[in-house]
Amino acid sequence: MKTYSAKPAEIEKKWVVIDASGLVVGRLATIIAMRLKGKHLPIYTPHVDCGDNIVVVNAEKAVFTGRKKDQKVYYHHTGFPGGIKERTAKFVLEGRFPERVIEKAVERMLARGPLGRKIMGNLRVYKGPSHPHEAQQPVALDVAALNRKNVRN
């Protein structure tokens, strides 16, 4: 019997919506990364984009455990000599684009090649409770119910 290899044409992508209110960022990101890759499916094929389209709402209400909100630092470089810049997770969460915390957490759990970039295109993160993807009829995924450690009150 030959090993099954999924073809891109025969994959049916589902739409999933996740409410990030009170969820721990790292635990949420692992679940999102797994579903984006399609590893929860029996037809998972490593070289094919077979995961779901995921919509995350209330990204600004996601939480860190411990003192990570103050101690976790995001670095970027301007390209100029000595141009390394840093921002704490607290600064990013309270800033203009708090959804970037979840985007970065998921992005760093995926491969950094062409397929990883394509898979990241299937993730949509919004800071508020509304999103423009109601026409796709996304199914709600209750991450808090999967494990009691996924949520902080």
From Swiss-Prot:
Pfam families attached to this UniProt entry: Ribosomal_L13 (PF00572)
CDD domains xref list: Ribosomal_L13
Cellular component, GO, one term: cytosolic large ribosomal subunit
GO molecular function: mRNA binding; structural constituent of ribosome
GO biological process, one term: translation
Quaternary assembly: Part of the 50S ribosomal subunit.
Function according to Swiss-Prot or TrEMBL: This protein is one of the early assembly proteins of the 50S ribosomal subunit, although it is not seen to bind rRNA by itself. It is important during the early stages of 50S assembly.
Family: Belongs to the universal ribosomal protein uL13 family.
HAMAP family named in the record: Ribosomal_uL13
Protein name: Large ribosomal subunit protein uL13
Source organism of this protein record: Xanthobacter autotrophicus (strain ATCC BAA-1158 / Py2)
Origin organism lineage: Bacteria, Pseudomonadati, Pseudomonadota, Alphaproteobacteria, Hyphomicrobiales
Gene of this entry: rplM
